[in-house]
Amino acid sequence: QLLELGYNRNGLGISLSGRRLEWMRSEIPSNGNLKSSSANLLNYIPAMCTQYTYMLTNLHPYTAQIGDAVYNNSGEIGGQADIFYNFKRGSALGGKRGLKIHANFSTYYTLHKEGTAKAGKLLYRDISIDIEKQFTRKFKAVLLYSMQEENPSYGRKSATRLQNVFVADLQYKFTPKFSTRLELQYLTTHEDEKDWMAALLEINFAPSWSIYGSDMYNNGGSKIHYFNAGVSYARSRTRIALSYGRNREGLLCSGGVCRLTRAYTGANLQITTSF
């Protein structure tokens, strides 16, 4: 079941959504049994929560629980609320070029019992706020804070992990064809792998070329650097990207679609085109 409500007036936008999933998994049995596997999953249902693009906000992404007979988990229930507000140009907070604020609250629980809408154990909760400000024609900044609480056992146990993530996204346009973007991120938590820090520098040569370098460092635990560097070229409807670096084991998400990846150090070549 899905319910959505929206309101938009005078720079204020509010979006409310709620969803209940029960036994929505559709898959081909592997080796004659019902063991769950992402390799034989026929359908994918995206999580209804903020889809982050920053490294540390995506460290433990949420995936929708669509029913798992092995762990006796029939589904999930929850929802999210989005609030957008644009401060007009010339106002006290808007200043010369305006100010945009977005806040999100999302939370999901297991189903306490099949066939009911009663919530069980907490699966995921996220409270976030981001502020976007165009200071000059050349300089724009985005500041984000996210408090995430997730259940590492996917509802089999009640224990959860809490983390706070801070992000500064700074963009500067030197010329219409040459710009840079700098990301500074920090994650603080007393659990799991403890604190993380990350940084990314991106240099763009419009309209085709882009190069970047990034590093994600587990300063509270393993003391391992997860570095990456890459270059991309885009023309017409095709984009080619080549990168090299160290990647950690975990869920890799893009556009709301997540897949489990192993830890590895190596190169990646990606070709994207549209018809």
Model regions and ranges:
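Exposed, low-structure sequence patches enriched in small/polar residues
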Residues: Q1-F275
